[in-house]
A protein has these predicted regions:
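N-terminal export/targeting signal detector
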Residues: 1-5, 132
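Compact, glycine-rich, soluble single-domain proteins
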Residues: 5-99
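Acidic/glycine-rich phosphate/pyrophosphate-binding loops and surrounding catalytic core
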Residues: 84-136
Length: 136
């Protein structure tokens, strides 16, 4: 299978850097599968699960909001946070979900509602990814 270079960057670190066969990304309009030779494009991502396939092994992780640029020579994703399932603090994610649910209920404006809804999406996505782990 053809490979392409993938780099996933957060404000704190380079989460992933290497050649892959594919990556599935939670795009704002729905999941997007990127493979070698994909048409160049830029799109926004939303909180959810990513799946990276490298050397025939599929590995899943949580990805927060951000954007991705697909170029002929590389694909680069920028995200606020990306975590492997084993690095997700389930208790912290559950607490964040409860706080976000409360804030959504008490929202004061459309802007607050959108921010709180995004926080809730992040918490739900982390909790969905945590028990899944790796698929081999």
């Amino acid at each position: 299978m053809n490979k392409f270079f993938l780099e996933i960057i957060t404000p704190e670190k380079t989460f992933y850097r290497g050649d892959v066969e594919s990556i599935q990304i939670p795009a704002v309009g729905g999941d997007c599968m990127i493979m070698a030779g994909h048409q160049p494009m830029v799109f926004a991502t939303q909180p959810g699960m990513i799946a990276i396939t490298a050397d025939g092994q599929r590995r899943e992780a949580f990805m927060s909001e951000g954007f991705i640029e697909v170029r002929p020579d590389a694909t680069i994703a920028f995200s606020q946070a990306v975590e492997w399932p084993e690095d997700i603090d389930e208790r912290r994610a559950e607490e964040a979900k409860e706080r976000a649910e409360e804030m959504v209920r008490r929202n004061r404006s459309a802007a607050e509602y959108q921010l709180n809804r995004l926080a809730l999406q992040r918490a739900f996505a982390r909790l969905r990814v945590k028990p899944r782990g790796n698929k081999e």
